[in-house]
């Protein structure tokens, strides 16, 4: 029977028609072969080029498998290669392996890099508009095990994984009908319990059949509700309604707080916004020393991810067991502007210079310094005068920061120690290593003694355990102005 694209000539025999058709096919095949027949060569530096078979190689090229050099030297199309790494960067190519033959991804075991890396194949893309093509024999199909895994995944989705069922289905609708008719309906007396293998509910039932049907869609991947605008499908009708508001711009949920006119397309977003108007922030960071609190858990997760405040399960147990004792509320210690004593671990900045700090030290109360003069208070205290978790604290001067670390680089605040008595607040240079002294009430204290406490320019208060500063590598602390009640807190 003749094809419709050929003229019907009754005077020609079938054999002549077949011979003419084969001749035209041979001519077309030869023309295409001459236009696309190229040779792959690998440069010494690992770069692969495609050049017509009649070309001569430029310097630095070698031929594979003893091929003879061609005769002429037309222009060369250079296709740079790089061995495939674990993750392909977006800058490698913007082409997709699904493109036409002119843009097809090549992954051929014959394209190998010479030397020790002969086992790693190269991948490259043919440029757009180049007109170059490669024979189909050079293209690799996915490995057999990958094809089997994909087929198994698709087939597994159409298997009823209800307990002791394992029936196979060709269509998704058949699987859905089977589950609804044979498994959901008989579960009415049992409380609509899901017995799908691996279900996270672990046998906990539903009080209504429609809830059970919605839950089953998480196992069967059924999405019966489709958006008429963008054709995106959803498993629940409520989700489709919320999605449609992104097309219509409707925002029916308004903030109930007086004076706030913000509106939202769904109630959950409005609920998150509403909590920002109230003081209650129940979600807090559990990293010791971090006092960040948030109104919703998503903001807390962003904070933990941004600052690396991850607490392991063992650390959480330690923090629960060893809670710091609370100070007794007395009338004498009325602190309205409490400030924490920040004792960070300087190992991240200063290398080996680290201060070991207990996880649960008790509050450090410097209320005994509340008098008209810090010097008189220090003179009346024994040596060592303060303790932290049973260890004596060294309040003597010490060389803490070297000249190499600038105050601007560390970002330390101004140093000032303020008691509840009458003390002058003077701006001090930011914390660096050096000598120490302090000004209070306009009287100069002699540096280098217990009375001359630690707050000269370029001085830092040393609270490392031990009487002598030589016992441990000293850490560094910063006391912001404005308080006398100081609570130790480890800072990441």
UniProtKB/Swiss-Prot annotation:
Key words of the record: Activator, Cytoplasm, Developmental protein, Differentiation, DNA-binding, Metal-binding, Neurogenesis, Nucleus, Repeat, Repressor, Transcription, Transcription regulation, Zinc, Zinc-finger
Residue ranges of the region described as Transcription repression: 138-161
Zinc finger boundaries on the chain: C2H2-type: 158-183, 192-219, 225-247, 253-277, 283-307
Biased composition (Basic and acidic residues): 423-444
SUPFAM superfamilies: beta-beta-alpha zinc fingers
Gene3D superfamilies noted in UniProt: Classic Zinc Finger (3.30.160.60)
Tagged with keyword RNA-binding: no
Any single Gene Ontology cellular-component annotation: cytoplasm
Region (Disordered): 49-101, 423-450
InterPro entries reported in the protein's UniProt record: GLI-like, Znf-C2H2_ZIC1-5/GLI1-3-like, Znf_C2H2_sf, Znf_C2H2_type
Induction: By ngn1.
Gene Ontology BP annotations: cell differentiation; negative regulation of DNA-templated transcription; nervous system development; positive regulation of DNA-templated transcription; regulation of transcription by RNA polymerase II
Renumbered residue ranges of the record's region Transcription activation: 69-129
Comp. bias regions, Low complexity: 82-97
Pfam families, A to Z: zf-C2H2, zf-C2H2_15
MF GO annotations: DNA-binding transcription factor activity, RNA polymerase II-specific; RNA polymerase II cis-regulatory region sequence-specific DNA binding; zinc ion binding
Tree of life domain: Eukaryota
Subcellular location: Nucleus speckle; Cytoplasm
Family: Belongs to the GLI C2H2-type zinc-finger protein family.
Summary of the function given for this chain in its UniProt record: Can act either as a transcription repressor or as a transcription activator, depending on the cell context. May be involved in neuron differentiation.
Domain characteristics, as noted in the entry: The C2H2-type zinc finger 1 has a major repressor function.
PANTHER family: GLIS FAMILY ZINC FINGER 2 (PTHR45718:SF8), TRANSCRIPTIONAL ACTIVATOR CUBITUS INTERRUPTUS (PTHR45718)
Name recorded for this polypeptide: Zinc finger protein GLIS2
Annotated organism of origin: Xenopus laevis
Origin organism lineage: Eukaryota, Metazoa, Chordata, Craniata, Vertebrata
């Amino acid at each position: 029977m003749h094809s419709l694209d050929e003229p019907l000539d009754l005077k020609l025999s079938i054999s002549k028609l077949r011979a003419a058709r084969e001749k035209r096919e041979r001519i077309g095949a030869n023309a295409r072969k001459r236009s696309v027949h190229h040779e792959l060569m690998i440069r010494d530096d690992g770069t692969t080029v495609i050049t017509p078979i009649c070309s001569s190689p430029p310097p630095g090229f070698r031929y594979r498998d003893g091929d003879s050099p061609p005769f002429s030297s037309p222009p060369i199309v250079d296709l740079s290669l790089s061995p495939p790494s674990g993750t392909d960067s977006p800058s490698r190519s913007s082409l997709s392996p699904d493109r036409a033959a002119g843009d097809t991804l090549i992954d051929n075991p014959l394209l190998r890099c010479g030397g020790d890396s002969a086992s790693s194949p190269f991948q490259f893309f043919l440029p757009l508009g180049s007109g170059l093509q490669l024979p189909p024999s050079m293209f690799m199909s996915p490995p057999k095990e990958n094809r089997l895994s994909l087929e198994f995944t698709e087939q597994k989705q159409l298997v009823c994984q209800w307990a002791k069922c394992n029936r196979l289905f060709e269509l998704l609708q058949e699987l859905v009908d089977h589950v609804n008719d044979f498994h959901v309906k008989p579960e009415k007396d049992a409380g609509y319990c899901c017995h799908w293998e691996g279900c996270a509910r672990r046998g906990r039932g539903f009080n209504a059949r429609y809830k059970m049907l919605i839950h089953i869609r998480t196992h069967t991947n059924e999405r019966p509700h489709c958006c008429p605008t963008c054709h995106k499908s959803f498993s629940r009708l409520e989700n489709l309604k919320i999605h449609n508001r992104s097309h219509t711009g409707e925002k029916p949920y308004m903030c109930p707080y007086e004076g706030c006119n913000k509106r939202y397309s769904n109630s959950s977003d409005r609920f998150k916004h509403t909590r920002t108007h109230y003081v209650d922030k129940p979600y807090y960071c559990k990293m010791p020393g971090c006092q960040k609190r948030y109104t919703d858990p998503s903001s807390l997760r962003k904070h933990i991810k941004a600052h690396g405040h991850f607490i392991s399960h063992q650390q959480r147990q330690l923090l629960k067991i060893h809670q710091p004792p609370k100070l007794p509320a007395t009338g004498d210690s009325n602190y309205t502007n409490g400030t924490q004593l920040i004792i960070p671990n300087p190992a991240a900045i200063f290398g080996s210079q680290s201060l070991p700090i207990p996880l649960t030290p008790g509050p450090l109360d410097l209320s005994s310094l509340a008098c008209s003069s810090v010097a008189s208070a220090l003179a009346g205290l024994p040596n060592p005068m303060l303790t932290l978790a049973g260890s004596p604290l060294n309040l003597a001067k010490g060389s803490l920061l070297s000249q190499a670390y600038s105050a601007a680089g560390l970002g330390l605040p101004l140093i000032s120690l303020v008691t509840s008595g009458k003390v002058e607040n003077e701006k001090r240079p930011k914390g660096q290593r050096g000598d120490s002294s302090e000004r209070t009430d306009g009287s100069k204290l002699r540096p280098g003694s217990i009375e001359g406490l630690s707050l000269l320019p370029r001085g830092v208060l040393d609270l490392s355990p031990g009487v002598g500063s030589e016992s441990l590598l000293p850490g560094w602390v910063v006391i912001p102005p404005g308080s006398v009640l100081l609570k130790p807190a480890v800072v990441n």
